[in-house]
Amino acid sequence: MCRTLALLASCAAVLAVAPVSAQRPTTDPLEPGLDTVITPTRLVQALSDVPASVTVISAETIERFGIRSIPEALRIVPGMSVIHATGPDYQISYHGTNTLSPRRMNVLIDGISVYRPAFSEVIWSQLPVAIEDVQRIEVTRGPNSASYGPNSMLAIVNIITRNPNDMTLGLGAGTLGSNGLRELTARTALRLGETAVGVTASTSRDRGFDSLTQDTAGHDSLRIDRLAIRSQSRTGTQSTLALQASVARGTAEIPFIDNFQQSYPDRRFEDFYAGAQWATQLAANHELSVRLDHARQSSRQSWRTCLPTVALLPEMFALWRANPRYANEVLAGRVPTGGTPTDNALALAAITAIQALGAGALAPRCVRANQDVIQRRLDLELQDTYVFSDRLRVVGGLGLREQSGESQTYLGGKQSSTVRWLFANVEYRPVEPLSLNVGGYFERNSLSPSTFSPRAGANIRLAPGHTLRLVLSNGTRSPDIQEQRTNWSYRFEDVTPPLNGSTTAFFYQSRTGPGNLKSERIRSREVGYLWNAQSMGLLVDARVFDDRLSDLISERTNLAGLVPTNAGSVRLTGAELQVNLRFGSEWNGYANYAYLDNREATNILERTQWSRHSGSIGLSRDFGGGWQAAVAYAGQSGNGYQQSAYGRTDLVLSRAFDVDRVRWRATFGLQRLDSPLATYSIGSAEPLESRRSNRLAGYVRLAVTVP
């Protein structure tokens, strides 16, 4: 089975790609001007019918406000916590909580998850999509495990790219800016019979921060190159085939890993994604689709470090494995007691080895360490959508995933798991003012016990343009391979001078996974209100919520830290307001605010990323003659443990003009930080700091579009 899936995925990669969403958002016919979305339930629904609060960031908004990256776009989302820790490192989570592991939010690109299976992470700076290819971003604010399963526990971000059928013949764009910013993007699209193909290549360079706690020289630049191919084909009168493949590769500078390092532990990465979706219209009211996705994410990280010889002794490695307390006692120069006879024998062997070294026990030996990781996932999913009547629609499906992580350091080799799932969502309108949504997602995971995530929502149209929303939902996050099955140890090579005649050695500390972790859980309650005043160009979405998170894996994961447990919990309550404005053809704007209360946390780490107050506001105007200007502000109060406040003002001025049917657009952007210093927590006694030398930053961008 796995070999067959792998072969199919490889074929899909060769063929090229396209968005894999069979249902494209349109406009709600009942309320003209009101967007429809697909992410919350997998059904195309009007915002007034979805059982969730949704933020939609359009390509127009991205262009108007000079947004240059997806992490920066998410600052618009009410309640979204965005911390730019270092140049390549963004810590992003809806409602924050644990900054050490912001792994409770799923991220999709055209419905394909980029969530990494072995470490439950999303590396935002390595997303394989150029901002120029983004058609819209749909953010479901609240648990969405009922539609997409575990890991969509707090929210889900769905990045929807441009359909090749809608792309122009060519696009070229270049950006120059402060902090060494250099960006180039080129895109072309063409039609080959019944197939439309789009190809985008981009490259980006950024110097990062000017100074870091762990490196005053600010060694945190990012260099990344991307290539994406998408295709959309008609394979019959009622069927389509969408294919996609993308790669992102580059180098992320890392300033620090250990106190004895002699070289920078920079990380070289290469991420590959491929997907195929075949969809067929079996009848006017019945659609079937099959999706196959493959991802391979490789990270190579090695550095030179010089450690005291005693830390490399095999006797110390064996003693730590048996009894870490004994090992610490021996290193402190004491004879440990209270252990088993085996512990005592291992302690005696370690003490004898240390005594044999004499003063050389503290002499440095230089080694080459690595944290290389390869993560893979292969998904096959069948989805069936059936419209019984104007009052009843159903979507359901099943899927299979094979996923693995391979790392000699973190996993002692290769660890794999298998995931199977079933899901369904039902939309029912018993009477015209009322829309009901009920859904659930059942998952069986070889890593942890099975889970079921249900959701029920009721949308009541009180009057034209006024909708009351009530939502009850439960969500989960499955423990990842590293949390559950870690076999963490450092095997050093090129030991200089050799130790006992060997050029390899193990660091004395190690860790194994508990193997008995269960899924994290959330129980969410929401009351929302949507006001669509089309005549005023106004759309307002307000909600209050009460989220109770339990069975959290809160502990800091490192060699000498606590063993991971499900002992954590926290309660998140608050309110959010989202306003979109459009006054005629000249004015556009938005205003968002979130109030969040993080309480009853059992572990301080669950309070390392949260802001009681956060929000954003933006306004743009078209002046005619191609001139356009925008101003925006985003900020958060930074109430988390060791977390600083954040605020930034953006000014954008652009001019679009045509020359011989070719559209040119020149953009100038200026940014001002409230503070050049950002602090964040890694669970240690002191916060880490990242600093800019100047509050002001600017950029210029020139884009040309060939129709």
Language model: regions and residue ranges:
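C-terminal beta-signal and adjacent terminal beta-strands/loops
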Residues: 476-477, 653-707
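Short acidic/polar hinge/loop motifs at secondary-structure boundaries
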Residues: 113-141
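Extracytoplasmic beta-strand/coil segments of soluble accessory domains associated
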Residues: 39, 46, 71-113, 135
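Gram-negative outer-membrane beta-barrel transporters
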Residues: 390, 394-395, 429-433, 537-550, ...
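Membrane-embedded beta-barrel scaffold of Gram-negative outer-membrane proteins
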Residues: 289-293, 297-301, 461, 469, ...
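Transmembrane beta-barrel wall of Gram-negative outer-membrane proteins
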Residues: 176-205, 215-252, 266-290, 388-394
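N-terminal Sec signal peptide and the immediately downstream disordered periplasmic leader
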Residues: 1-67, 71-77, 189, 234, ...
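N-terminal periplasmic accessory domains that precede
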Residues: 70-73, 90-96, 105-110, 124-127, ...
